[in-house]
Amino acid sequence: MNPVMFNIGRVEFRWYSFFVLIAVLVGFVLALREGKRRNIDKDIIFDMGFYTVIFGILGARLYYVLFNLDVYQHDFLEIFRLWNGGLAIHGGILIGLLTIYLFSKLRKVNMLELTDIVAPSLVLGQAIGRWGNFFNSEAHGPVTTLTNLQSLKIIPDFVIKGMKIDGVYYHPTFYYEFLWCLLGFIIILLVRKFYKNRKSGQITCLYLMIYSLGRFFIESLRTDSLMIKTFKAAQVISVILFVASFIFFIILLFKKEEKVKIKTNKRIEKKENKNDNKLDNEVKEDKKVKTTSTKAVTKKTTKKTSTKTSSKKTSSTKKTKKAKSE
């Protein structure tokens, strides 16, 4: 596969950078929509997203570099060439969570509600970002045959062709992870829609459990894994994240929800206040109209009664006068 989309002079625009950018944009859109649905000020989502993306990418790169110091010590500038690949998602997740934690403390907002907003964006972004690995011809599995790949039925022909590297076919583990992340995204959306009594943080735990479970098994096929002595680093981190998130999910089931105020959308509040004021004014006007109409009716009735009584008095006085004259 050709990793370069196009060139403008000496500047290369690579597929890897393109898919990372698309993943970030899609993630922002999803987070903003969910924030709006929860009536959270979009400035909070923007600020949180900005810092999380920046430090998340830095964390993913730092994690990768630390496991490949022997490569980068000979070419220090290669550390900054992110378009060549070399982002480890676990580093991004860990630093991203730390960033959101610090952000929530500074803004005095609920961290778990923010991570619940981010979780669907992150897993979908991971699915999109894996296509950058495809064009870089990286993150693949062991050697296999064309027949084996075709027998799986779920792998498109263009992916199979792209997995032929130097005349040899490899397992497209990037594609397996793409499908797993896509499935995880659908599951999270369904749980978020139908599990109404969930606690803040359970969506985050669900994301970590789903991704860690899939990554553990897919990593066993990877041939370019980062290693901790004789263990694959991604599998070790996946086990830790799965166990920790599972325990925390159970704890949240029995924990009372503590409502921490998050700055809500001012525009929506203003509109609601205006509508409430309009309704109050309309009710007041209706009351005024009713009171004035009732007053007018009472005045008319008193006038009628007074005229009737006066006419009766005059008639009675006339009768008495006639009687006296007689």
Where would I find each of the regions flagged by the language model?
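A feature for loop-to-transmembrane-helix boundaries and adjacent hydrophobic helices
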Residues: 1-284, 326
